C-alpha cells in the first residue's frame, strides 16, 4: 500500500477527495491544497491516468525536522537515492517554503540537489545530471516552519497538461480547473452543453472527454514515474490499453453534443485543433460568432447547460463594454435558453450581477492568484426577453428626468458638452457628462468606510442604467474614477490612446480627450465665464494664466481680441491649446503660447493687458515661492502682481475652485483694486445643484486709480 498526496487548486479539495474515492482510494484526508490518500500500485497509476482535478500526484519519501541547512542536507541524503532512480537519469528539484534558516527557495533547492548528487557519488562514484527541462525524475520538497517533506513527483509535468492544448487564446483556464467548473455546473453526461465564449475550447473539450469516458492522461507523452526504479511497466501498459478501449467505446456511445463559439476566428481554429488532438472533435461544433448573434443550437430540445468563463477585464476602460456584454447575455439566456441550466465562472461577481439573474448555487475557487466565483442558474422560459426591474432604478429615474430637461436646454444654447448628473443622489456618487455623441461617467472615490465590493457593485449598476437610459452603445461610454490629485498627478496620463474628439461650444470648436487624462481638456463649469471673456475681449489684449488647454483664449480670439497670450507650465497642454486655436483659425504671431511657471512668469514680465483671466490651482508648489501656493492665503500677492500688468481700464476675471473661498476685500482695496463677485452669473443650468463648484470675480482698478 502506498501513501500518496494529490495536490489541487484551493477550493477544489472536496471535489478531489470524492474523485479519488470513486477511483478506489482509501483513508482520504483533506488538507489545504490537496488530499492525502492510500492505495496500491494499480490505484496509484489509475489516479495519475484518470484524475481530472489533481495538479500533481506525489509519493512521499521522507519527513524530518530542519533547524539549519545542514539538517536539510542530511535529511535528504538519508534517502537511498540510487535505489529510486539510476545514475544515468536526469533529475530536477522543486523546492517551496522557507523558515528562519532556509530563507530562499533557490538556496533550499541547491542544498537538496547537492545532497542527492553526493548520495550517488558516495555510493557509486558517479553523479546524475540535473535537467531543468523535462527531467526524468522530479523531486518535490516542501518546507513549512521546521518540518520538511520530500516526495517523488510521479506526474512529471503538472497533470493539467493533458497533451491536447498546444495553442490557447488569452487567459486560458487550466484543464483541471475547467473540469472542476464542469462538475460543479450540474451538467450531466448525455446532455448538450454550450459555451458561447469558448476561447480555445478547454471547457468544451474537458466535458466531451468526460462524456466519452476518455482518461485525461491518455494523451500525455511524458510522466514522472517511467524512470523510477519501481515503475511497473506491464501494469501501466494494461491500464492505458484499458483506457484506450473505454475511450473508443465511449465516443461511439455518448449522446452528448457540444457547441462553442467565440468572436475571434483565430482562437476558434485553435479550439478545433485542440479538440482533434484530444480525440473529441466529432462531438464539438465550433463557430466564429459575435455573442450578439448567439442562438440556441437545439431550440426543439433536449435542454442542456450553458457553461462559460466570460471576460472580466482588469482595466477600467473595458468595464462599460463588459457590463453591456453581461447585461445582453442575461437577456439572451432568458429569451433563447429557457429551461436550460447556466453556470458562469468569473473573477468579477459584480459583472455577474449585471446578468440580472438569480443564482441558486455559488462556489468559490482560485484561478491562479485570482479569487473567483462560480454561479449556477436555472433559466426560466421568457420568449419576450423582459429584462426585469432596472437596476439602480432611483438613479435611472433621476437621470431620465435630467436628460429630458438638459438635452433641450443644451440644444437651445448651442453647446454639445454638459453635465447630465452630478451626485444628485447620495447612493450614486458619480458625475455624468455628455460630450457630443459620447458620455463620461466619473466615479467620485468612495470613503474608506464603504465596502469596496459594494461600491464597485453600485458603480456597475450605474453604468448599466446609464447605457439603458441613454440608449448608448458601450463603446460610447468612458469610465473614470476621480480622486483628490496630488502634485503632478493631474498631468499624468491614464491611458495612451491619443484619441481626440472635436466638440462645439457656442461658436467655438474645441478638442477634448476623454480617455488619456483625468480631465478631458474642457472644464464644463467655466462655460459661461469663457463666453463672457469672448464678449469682453473685442479689440483687447488678452492674457490667459494657468491656461490648461487654452479654451478661454479661443473664446477671446473668436470674440475679436487684438492678441491672446496663453501661459501654462505643461508642454502637453500648450500643444493642445495650439490645436484648439488652430482649428478655430486663430493663428499668427498675435496668438502667443508660453511654457512657463505662471507665478514666475508673472513676476518677471512687464507687459500690459486689457483682459486677464486667471484660474489658479487651489494649492500647488511653485519655484517662485519658497514654500507653496495656497489660493486663499496668497491671492493678495497674486493680485498685486496682476495689477502691474493690468491697463487702467482693464479687467481681471479671477476664478478658483476652493470651497468656502473668502476674498480679502479690504486687502484688495488697499492694493487700489475693486472686486465684484459674479459667481452666480457664471453658473449654468447643468450645474444648478452644485453652486460651490467654483467662485468667480471681476477685479478692476479702483476709481481713484483710474
UniProtKB/Swiss-Prot annotation:
UniProt EC number: 2.1.1.173, 2.1.1.264
Protein name per Swiss-Prot or TrEMBL: Ribosomal RNA large subunit methyltransferase K/L
Catalytic activity: guanosine(2445) in 23S rRNA + S-adenosyl-L-methionine = N(2)-methylguanosine(2445) in 23S rRNA + S-adenosyl-L-homocysteine + H(+); guanosine(2069) in 23S rRNA + S-adenosyl-L-methionine = N(2)-methylguanosine(2069) in 23S rRNA + S-adenosyl-L-homocysteine + H(+)
PANTHER family reported in the protein's UniProt record: RIBOSOMAL RNA LARGE SUBUNIT METHYLTRANSFERASE K/L, RIBOSOMAL RNA LARGE SUBUNIT METHYLTRANSFERASE K_L
Pfam families hit by this protein: Methyltrans_SAM (PF10672), RlmL_1st (PF22020), THUMP (PF02926), UPF0020 (PF01170)
Predominant place of localization: cytoplasm
Gene Ontology cellular-component annotations: cytoplasm
EC class (word): transferase
Localization per Swiss-Prot or TrEMBL: Cytoplasm
Keyword Methyltransferase attached: yes
Molecular function as annotated in GO: 23S rRNA (guanine(2445)-N(2))-methyltransferase activity; RNA binding; rRNA (guanine-N7-)-methyltransferase activity
Biological role stated in the UniProt entry: Specifically methylates the guanine in position 2445 (m2G2445) and the guanine in position 2069 (m7G2069) of 23S rRNA.
Keywords: Cytoplasm, Methyltransferase, RNA-binding, rRNA processing, S-adenosyl-L-methionine, Transferase
Amino acid at each position: 500500500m502506498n501513501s500518496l498526496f494529490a495536490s489541487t487548486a484551493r477550493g477544489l479539495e472536496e471535489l478531489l477527495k470524492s474523485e479519488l474515492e470513486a477511483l478506489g482510494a482509501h483513508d482520504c484526508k483533506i488538507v489545504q491544497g490537496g488530499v492525502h490518500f492510500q492505495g496500491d500500485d494499480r490505484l496509484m497509476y489509475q489516479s495519475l491516468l484518470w484524475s481530472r482535478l489533481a495538479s500533481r500526484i506525489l509519493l512521499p519519501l521522507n519527513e524530518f525536522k530542519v533547524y539549519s541547512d545542514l539538517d536539510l542536507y542530511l535529511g535528504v541524503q538519508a534517502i537511498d537515492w540510487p535505489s529510486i532512480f539510476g545514475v544515468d537519469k536526469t533529475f530536477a528539484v522543486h523546492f517551496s517554503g522557507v523558515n528562519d534558516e532556509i530563507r530562499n527557495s533557490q538556496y533550499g533547492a541547491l542544498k537538496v540537489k547537492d545532497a542527492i548528487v553526493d548520495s550517488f557519488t558516495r555510493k557509486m562514484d558517479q553523479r546524475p545530471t540535473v535537467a531543468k527541462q523535462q527531467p526524468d525524475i522530479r523531486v518535490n520538497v516542501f518546507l513549512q516552519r521546521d518540518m520538511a517533506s520530500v516526495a517523488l513527483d510521479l506526474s512529471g509535468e503538472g497533470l493539467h497538461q493533458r497533451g491536447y492544448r498546444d495553442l490557447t487564446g488569452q487567459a486560458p483556464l487550466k484543464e483541471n480547473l475547467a473540469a472542476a467548473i464542469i462538475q460543479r455546473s450540474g451538467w450531466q453526461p448525455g446532455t448538450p452543453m454550450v459555451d458561447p465564449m469558448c476561447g480555445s475550447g478547454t471547457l468544451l473539450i474537458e466535458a466531451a472527454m468526460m462524456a466519452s469516458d476518455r482518461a485525461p492522461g491518455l494523451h500525455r507523452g511524458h510522466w514522472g514515474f517511467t524512470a523510477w526504479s519501481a515503475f511497473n511497466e506491464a501494469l501501466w501498459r494494461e491500464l492505458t490499453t484499458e483506457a484506450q478501449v473505454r475511450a473508443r467505446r465511449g465516443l461511439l456511445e455518448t449522446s452528448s453534443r457540444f457547441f462553442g463559439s467565440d468572436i475571434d476566428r483565430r482562437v476558434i481554429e485553435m479550439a478545433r485543433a485542440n479538440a482533434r488532438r484530444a480525440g473529441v472533435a466529432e462531438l464539438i461544433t465550433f463557430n466564429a460568432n459575435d455573442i450578439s448573434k448567439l442562438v440556441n443550437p437545439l431550440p426543439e430540445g433536449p435542454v442542456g447547460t450553458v457553461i462559460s468563463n466570460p471576460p472580466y477585464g482588469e482595466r477600467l476602460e473595458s468595464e462599460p463594454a463588459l457590463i453591456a456584454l453581461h447585461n445582453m447575455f442575461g437577456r439572451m439566456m432568458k429569451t433563447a435558453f429557457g429551461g436550460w441550466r447556466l453556470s458562469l465562472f468569473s473573477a468579477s461577481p459584480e459583472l455577474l450581477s449585471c446578468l440580472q439573474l438569480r443564482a441558486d448555487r455559488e462556489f468559490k475557487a482560485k484561478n491562479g492568484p485570482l479569487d473567483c466565483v462560480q454561479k449556477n442558474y436555472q433559466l426560466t422560459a421568457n420568449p419576450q426577453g423582459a429584462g426585469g426591474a432596472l437596476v439602480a432604478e432611483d438613479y435611472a429615474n433621476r437621470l431620465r428626468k435630467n436628460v429630458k430637461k438638459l438635452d433641450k436646454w443644451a440644444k437651445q444654447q448651442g453647446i454639445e458638452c454638459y453635465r447630465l448628473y452630478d451626485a444628485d443622489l447620495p447612493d450614486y456618487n458619480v458625475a455624468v457628462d455628455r460630450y457630443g455623441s459620447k458620455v463620461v461617467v466619473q466615479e467620485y472615490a468612495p470613503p474608506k468606510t464603504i465596502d469596496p465590493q459594494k461600491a464597485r457593485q453600485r458603480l456597475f449598476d450605474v453604468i448599466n442604467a446609464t447605457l439603458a437610459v441613454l440608449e448608448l452603445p458601450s463603446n460610447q461610454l468612458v469610465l473614470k474614477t476621480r480622486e483628490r490629485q496630488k502634485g503632478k498627478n493631474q498631468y499624468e496620463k491614464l491611458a495612451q490612446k491619443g484619441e481626440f474628439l472635436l466638440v462645439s461650444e457656442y461658436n467655438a470648436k474645441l478638442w477634448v480627450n476623454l480617455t488619456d487624462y483625468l480631465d478631458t481638456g474642457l472644464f464644463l463649469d467655466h462655460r459661461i465665464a469663457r463666453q463672457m471673456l469672448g464678449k469682453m475681449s473685442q479689440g483687447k489684449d488678452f492674457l490667459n494664466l494657468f491656461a490648461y488647454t487654452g479654451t478661454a483664449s479661443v473664446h477671446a480670439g473668436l470674440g475679436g481680441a487684438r492678441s491672446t497670450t496663453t501661459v501654462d507650465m505643461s508642454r502637453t497642454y500648450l500643444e493642445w491649446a495650439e490645436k484648439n486655436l488652430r482649428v478655430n483659425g486663430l493663428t499668427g504671431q498675435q496668438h502667443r503660447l508660453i511654457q512657463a511657471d505662471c507665478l514666475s512668469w508673472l513676476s518677471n514680465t512687464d507687459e500690459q493687458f486689457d483682459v486677464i483671466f486667471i484660474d489658479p490651482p487651489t494649492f500647488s508648489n511653485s519655484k517662485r515661492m519658497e514654500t507653496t501656493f495656497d489660493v486663499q492665503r496668497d491671492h493678495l500677492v497674486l493680485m498685486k502682481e496682476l495689477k502691474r500688468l493690468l491697463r487702467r481700464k482693464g479687467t481681471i476675471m479671477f476664478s478658483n475652485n476652493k470651497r468656502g473661498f473668502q476674498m480679502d476685500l479690504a486687502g484688495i482695496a488697499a492694493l487700489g483694486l475693486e472686486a465684484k463677485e459674479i459667481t452666480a452669473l457664471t453658473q449654468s443650468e447643468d450645474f444648478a445643484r452644485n453652486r460651490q463648484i467654483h467662485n468667480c470675480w471681476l477685479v478692476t482698478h479702483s476709481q481713484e486709480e483710474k
